[in-house]
Amino acid sequence: MLGFPPGRPQLPVQLRPQTRMATALRDPASGSVTFEDVAVYFSWEEWDLLDEAQKHLYFDVMLENFALTSSLGCWCGVEHEETPSEQRISGERVPQFRTSKEGSSSQNADSCEICCLVLRDILHLAEHQGTNCGQKLHTCGKQFYISANLQQHQRQHITEAPFRSYVDTASFTQSCIVHVSEKPFTCREIRKDFLANMRFLHQDATQTGEKPNNSNKCAVAFYSGKSHHNWGKCSKAFSHIDTLVQDQRILTREGLFECSKCGKACTRRCNLIQHQKVHSEERPYECNECGKFFTYYSSFIIHQRVHTGERPYACPECGKSFSQIYSLNSHRKVHTGERPYECGECGKSFSQRSNLMQHRRVHTGERPYECSECGKSFSQNFSLIYHQRVHTGERPHECNECGKSFSRSSSLIHHRRLHTGERPYECSKCGKSFKQSSSFSSHRKVHTGERPYVCGECGKSFSHSSNLKNHQRVHTGERPVECSECSKSFSCKSNLIKHLRVHTGERPYECSECGKSFSQSSSLIQHRRVHTGKRPYQCSQCGKSFGCKSVLIQHQRVHIGEKP
């Protein structure tokens, strides 16, 4: 009964139900088993990791396990004298889903810190799918498995505008599919998640507020007897007033659960508990390949793809694949051109909110990440991590072709294109292609003329922030890069690289026409004009043209009477 049917997708082995329940089913006297013992807890990150088939399988298995534990008469692990048919399960007494059974059976429901909406909805479903061991309402004879639902129903008889429930015999999986795919919940300001949607509002009832019928499209619906609850600041509709209160918390920040370490606010206590793991030393998931530990199972799974090379999320537009779903979602905005996040300072827009937040630091000058070795600070955390490898010498990313290693994975990806010749970034204006997205972005500014970085001293503008930084050293006189051969200093590293060729004699740029080589690419470009006859620099006074800008400047001195 606990096994997974042939052909059905498998849950990750760490998340499968424990074997204690199977033992208890074979020999009930061997020990009491509770639903907590076999239930599986998912954090929000872990839940997002599952695909739709696995989510449906999870609900199937949990519902089946719930029915079995209920039939054994050992629901929540709290000892009392009631018979199974008299046991009450309060809507507020929802057990914890755990991967570890430690302490789960000794805690009563009132001390439970994690209250998951998923289980509550599973219990609602169990009530409506024919479980006949619940409580009986003497007023009208209707039976309920959950005492909270009994209390809500009793309000009908005292005219308290109760929440009502109407169901048919549609399967739980059908309900999942309908409400995940049709997405009947709308909100302009709040990002809805799947677990909040497990209230199972009928599509028609959401739109009209009318009582849903026994359509096979909806397994269970809960809503107010008169109309849905709405809040003036948000268009989202709710079937339960407690969900509305939670939604109001998101917008007003009232009654939130706040982390004492960092001040982050959560709308649910269970979310706060999950968040607090970030601050704790608890890292229960260890990678067998490299020994790295992780706080969340989802982070562990994603990390393993570094070793396996698995990239399960493919872009339907270009076929490019990714190891994480959010990376795919971010990538798809490249095709759609969607850039919804705009900077209020300069108007620049971004496809991701995190990119906008990082960009804002250009204007504010904030650099919150500081190196403990040299005191250098950075605006982004990953920049600090990369910088620290300068001190440690760590170069973990190695090329399989030539053995060259790199401190950044992105550098390795770019390097591999030297071997493959791949140039995936093509300009739609001129057709020129590039190996790196940064080079492509820089090139596009040639066509747009965009120069967003302005010098505060002289007003000169630049297309790149790095160019502005180098330029500002003209005003400050800073020359932080020094030659180890002759102690000559330079304002930027690129100038040092060019200078070092004076000492090494390296001349990497060779003319394909005559074989002459040069130490700088600009010198090769000027030399090629000898073969092509191109003279792009023209004198405005006499119309004479030149192949080199410096020669034009010298020529112009003839007109102004200045001696060259």
From Swiss-Prot:
A cellular-component GO term for this protein: nucleus
Gene3D superfamilies referenced in this protein's UniProt entry, alphabetically: 6.10.140.140, Classic Zinc Finger
GO molecular function annotations of the record: DNA-binding transcription factor activity, RNA polymerase II-specific; RNA polymerase II cis-regulatory region sequence-specific DNA binding; zinc ion binding
Domain of life: Eukaryota
Disulfide bond entries: none
InterPro entries per the UniProt record, alphabetical: C2H2-ZF_domain, KRAB, KRAB_dom_sf, Znf_C2H2_sf, Znf_C2H2_type
Zinc finger map (C2H2-type): 131-157, 257-279, 285-307, 313-335, 341-363, 369-391, 397-419, 425-447, 453-475, 481-503, 509-531, 537-559
Entry-linked PROSITE patterns: KRAB (PS50805), ZINC_FINGER_C2H2_1 (PS00028), ZINC_FINGER_C2H2_2 (PS50157)
UniProt keyword Zinc-finger present: yes
Coiled coil: none
Residue span(s) of domain KRAB: 33-106
One Pfam family named in its UniProt record: zf-C2H2
GO BP annotations listed: regulation of transcription by RNA polymerase II
Keyword annotations from UniProtKB, A to Z: DNA-binding, Metal-binding, Nucleus, Repeat, Transcription, Transcription regulation, Zinc, Zinc-finger
Region called Disordered, residue ranges: 85-108
Location in the cell: Nucleus
Key word Ribosomal protein present: no
Similarity annotation: Belongs to the krueppel C2H2-type zinc-finger protein family.
Function: May be involved in transcriptional regulation.
The protein's name in its UniProt record: Zinc finger protein 211
Species whose genome carries this gene: Homo sapiens (Human)
Gene this chain is encoded by: ZNF211
